[in-house]
Regions:
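Helix-loop junctions at the membrane interface of multi-pass solute transporters
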Residues: 76-77, 110-118, 278-280
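Membrane-interface alpha-helices at helix entry/exit sites of multi-pass transporters
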Residues: 84-89, 103-108, 115-132, 284-294
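Mid-bilayer segments of alpha-helical transmembrane spans in multi-pass integral membrane proteins
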Residues: 95-104, 132-144
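Transmembrane alpha-helical cores of Major Facilitator Superfamily
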Residues: 96, 130-133, 257, 297
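Predominantly cytoplasmic-facing regulatory/coupling regions of multi-pass membrane proteins
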Residues: 1-92, 148-260, 282-285, 290-292, ...
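Transmembrane helix boundary and interhelical junction motifs in multipass membrane proteins
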Residues: 66-69, 100-111, 259-275
Length: 332
């Protein structure tokens, strides 16, 4: 009997909690949108220039490409070197899976798309889990670092929320502990086993120097995600965008990681609420609400376009030696 079956209440919490959170947030956004004047909202959206829409979407794609790069680094550390474009393709196409309940579908799509290149499903899944853990941990630590620097230097207030430092510290602890290499590998194997795959043993030969280099790339990715929001704000309220660059480097990771921890599909609702609340003192109710919702729209459309282009534009060509790969790999 599995640990999960011994504790059915844990499974119920995992199912019920995201639903309750989404219902509460849906009520909040319904009330906020009801109070928003349609003409004002339409005028604000129409006033956003094309460069802000396109630039924000492009920066988002560059930002999440850092996670794809880190995933490839992990695969290389396990002795596999699939084609670069195939790795990027698998990563972006799999993003649609994060909107399904649970955390596993996106990772399974990744693993399935790389299987034709001789990468065992279990290995792709395990390294994908480690990548997600590190992306969240680096984001939390990056946000906490930026917040600490701003507060210690007496710069402009990061947020009106007095609980922000405690939220950042809690998220950092929650995400950094399982990201520790030995524990993340163990967690990845346990997750693979729960999904019905044989985790087996894989040789993980990635040193701390490579991991830290990958973490630096992930931090650059979080900067790009922050600039994606800033560019959107620049299109809505140009005078207010520049002063928000550094504070937003704490808000965006907090909102994204918070959405992940809350376990709503794709972080939907949670991320928008946290960004809206962070922007509220700086932009006002209407612009803060629109910025949060439009950012979700831009990021989702950018993901969909990138996945469609990569899916239709680059078909994987399977080398002959991979087609006749080791039977042990095929069984895995």
């Amino acid at each position: 009997m599995t640990t999960l079956s011994k504790r059915p209440w844990i499974a119920w919490i995992r199912v019920v909690l995201p639903i309750v959170v989404m219902i509460l947030l849906a009520g909040h956004f319904y009330r906020s949108l009801s109070a928003l004047d349609d003409l004002d909202a339409g005028a604000m959206i129409a006033s956003i220039p094309v460069w802000a829409w396109c630039g924000s979407g492009t920066l988002y794609l560059v930002g999440i490409s850092a996670s794809a790069f880190f995933w490839r680094l992990l695969l290389n550390g396990c002795g596999h070197n699939p084609p670069f474009i195939s790795t990027i393709r698998a990563f972006f196409v799999s993003q649609a899976g994060k909107y399904a309940p649970g955390k596993g579908l996106a990772l399974l799509i990744r693993a399935a798309l790389l299987r034709t290149h001789g990468v065992p499903m279990t290995l792709s899944l395990a390294t994908g889990i480690i990548e997600v853990l590190w992306t969240m941990a680096v984001g939390s630590l990056f946000a906490l670092t930026i917040y600490t620097i701003l507060e210690c230097t007496g710069s402009s207030s990061t947020s009106a929320d007095p609980w922000l430092p405690f939220k950042l510290l809690a998220l950092t602890c929650v995400t950094a502990v399982p990201a520790y290499p030995a524990w993340s590998i163990r967690l990845a194997r346990a997750s693979a086993r729960k999904l019905g795959l044989d985790p087996g043993e894989f040789d993980f030969r990635l040193g701390w120097q490579s991991l830290l280099a990958g973490a630096a790339v992930l931090a650059c990715g979080w900067i790009c995600l922050t600039l994606s929001l800033i560019l959107l704000i620049a299109g809505m309220a140009p005078a207010k965008a520049f002063p928000l660059i550094l504070p937003a480097m704490a808000w965006v990771p907090l909102a994204s990681v918070g959405g992940f921890v809350a376990s709503t599909p794709g972080g939907i609702g949670v991320r928008e609420y946290l960004i809206e609340q962070a922007l509220l003192p700086h932009l006002g109710a209407n612009q803060a609400l629109l910025a949060a919702l439009l950012l979700r729209l831009i990021w989702t459309v950018a993901e969909a376009v990138a996945a469609l282009v990569l899916w239709l534009g680059w078909r994987d060509s399977v080398p002959m030696q991979v087609q006749h790969s080791n039977p042990a790999d095929q069984k895995s």
